[in-house]
């Protein structure tokens, strides 16, 4: 049996995005003997310009003239993750079997918000408007099976998919804290506010073993709502983190520990939010030590923010191999057909890192 994963180049003009394709099973002797999964779809143009031609060329997944995708996973409803999935779902050349996605307009009740005038119906409309692209994806795939999401393990066509987070309560807390939603009730826990600059960065000389971390930098509530998924198949382990932040990742690591799930032996960890240092801290990164490779999805010209030089050097000290898309498709496989592609070099140490 075989497995392969591809992080496709998404974004331009300093704006990164996520689009991941995976397939496993018998990748040689018939299209019906493999399973194809797409995780996030990048921007509006990603489907037509990148993902669709890629699937046709490399995944051999056209059945009776349609591109067959067994499972689509939306990590969270940010534009750089969901927009391309909408275009894919609208395409008459595509057949999708199943979708895993949160639907906040179906999952939250008016009791989470202060405005006493909100009814269940009006809240559904407001959340649908707030997360318009995700709602559009839900609408155009209304006849496709969707799984109600919770932490736990799902057996899927010979593979194991474990949702490590978020729990339903933490997910609802994230949505209630989102800038796009009404003001949450007092009993709803506040998440740390987003801090950190997106402007030009300042650098300082790097000194081995002396990297400091600012735990006051945080990601957004909507990023914290990201699905964190451990995929396992035939000895392969891949951890997918969406744009999850420190709270979500810490919760997921704790859940894994309580349930005897190891995260220090993964083949690949897709690092959150294009390699932003705001999403992780040393204790989170230490939980991954022993795993093999870290993958980053980012454009090549991102003002130096993604991936973080501080993060790259910290993980180099932990002996990780690290790779990024940076305008190219990032591929890894086990027993997969040879594409004749060249190996890519992993990151070395930076001489300077962000202050």
Language model: regions and residue ranges:
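Conserved beta-strand hairpin/beta-sheet module of binuclear metal-dependent hydrolase folds
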Residues: 1-66, 221-247
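Flexible, acidic/histidine-containing loops and adjacent segments that form or flank the divalent-metal
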Residues: 2-5, 10, 90-237, 316, ...
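Divalent metal-coordination and catalytic microenvironments
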Residues: 9, 22, 40, 76, ...
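Active-site environment of divalent metal-dependent phosphoester hydrolases
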Residues: 44-46, 77-83, 106-109, 170, ...
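Metal-dependent catalytic neighborhoods of phosphoester/phosphodiester hydrolases
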Residues: 49-50, 82-91, 111-114, 281-285, ...
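Long, well-ordered mid-to-C-terminal structural blocks that present hydrophobic/aromatic surfaces
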Residues: 229-273, 279
